[in-house]
Amino acid sequence: QAGIERFFVTIWPTALFTFTSEERRALRLAARGAYRFRKINDPRLAKWLIHRGGPSAVGGLETIQPEIARHLVKTSESLRLHGIQYIDEQLAECLIQHNGRTLYLDNLHHVDLEVLEILIRHTGRGLSLGGIENLSVQEASVLATYRGRLSLNKLTNPNSEILAALVQHTGKSLSLGSLKTLSRPQAQQLKKYRGDLYLRGIQELPPGIDVEFTDFPQ
């Protein structure tokens, strides 16, 4: 009997019964991928979601308190925080503890340099900053030190100086999905990259530019 009691305690923790009926309904829908939370104040909800909720359940969060983030980062999968438009240093310190696949922060349109210097310490496989359209050379140099896969898929027409900084990236891959074409100076910088380079927005190169990539690593 004691063994049976322990079994039920493991599967149905006491805290589960203290959720409101509205919270329980939201959790059931989230498990089926049919509900996205905009705000979470209860760490128990975050803990439940990260283990049993669908991956999109937290994608709509517009604000995250550090005590909530400490639970969310425990997922071994990608953490998609598409609703977050601003993070400070305290939240960044929590998010970099994510050790899963990719950390998606694609709704950040600007990130303070101090926060970038924290984000590059992210311990997961990849970092996606798909909302940033412009970078300074200094910011590009900081991002280049990130050791995982780096995605900057909204970066618009970076000049050769910024690309010169980015191609120093030491991680496995660099994705610049918004580039529609390449000038020769841009191509001359990008060919120096030694990882996997993803330029999915380019459908056709100007005449002669492809020659710049003749010796690009395969």
Go through the PLM ranges and name each one:
Residues G3, F7-P13, A31-N41, H51-I64, ...:
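Concave beta-strand-loop units of leucine-rich repeat
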Residues Q1-A2, L16, R24:
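A detector of long low-complexity, disordered segments enriched in serine/threonine/proline
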